[in-house]
Amino acid sequence: AIGLVGSEMCIRDRHTSEWVDPVCVDYREVQLCELPPNGQGFAALQMVSILKNANLAKWKRDDPKVWHFLTEAKRLAFEDLARYYADPAFANIPTKELLSEEYGKKRFDLINPENAMASFGPGEFSFTSEGDTTYLTVADSNGMMVSLIQSNYRGMGSGLVPDGLGFMLQDRGELFSMDPSHPNVYAPGKRPFHTIIPAFIMQNGLPLMSFGLMGGSMQPQGHVQILINMFDYGMNPQEAGDAARTVSYTHLTLPTNSNV
């Protein structure tokens, strides 16, 4: 189908699925687990690593301080997202360093508790190197859970339907970088950075809850806000989802737009 409109993609560029181990960060008495890069779930883990230094529960949930720390933690995490997140098969990503307690504290210390910073930069490491998403979660009486998310990107994806097959091809290749020095630069057989991130919360080594949401770069921000709503403010899942939230929309190449 895509060859009919002049695409250079061929069968060698086909998708290959793989099993991966989730990456987890401790928060209060639970663990937040996300998929590793090439997705943005890592940003939620970085936000948690930063926010665990804030002791948010000492403020009411709607206190401006809580919104301030959430917004600044997101900005810090997304600076690293734009610099480092890519397909780990093609780039050396400092995953351990990005999630270390020392680095989380270092990034937290950059936050001015009284004012938003004009700008942040990504961390430096000495190493070389729109409504289009559906989320589904299900659990059974035995505690088995599935956390599933899918998206064609850009609403109708590529707009191309393989003849006779009845589904739309996605176009997430848009999220490759065109900068040849960037770890997420496009390359044959390479997976682009993407935003779709199913999540789990673990407790004592066992799954406690599967969850996720839609909304591009809102997703890691939403994961973190669900986590603090439940485990800093004692909300149940319904209350955590209904609560007010902050979101700062970020594109790798476009200005940031923040909303509450």
Residue ranges and their predicted role:
Residues A1, S7-E8, R12-L32, P37:
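Long, well-ordered, tryptophan-enriched scaffold segments
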Residues A1-G6, I11, H251-V260:
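Single conserved hydrophobic/aromatic residue that forms the stacking wall/gate
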Residues P36-G41, I149-G159, L213-Q219:
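Glycine-rich phosphate/pyrophosphate-binding beta-alpha loops
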Residues M144-M209, Y233, P237-Q238:
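Active-site rim segments in enzyme catalytic domains, especially the processed small/beta chain
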Residues P237-L252:
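Compact, glycine/acidic-enriched structural inserts
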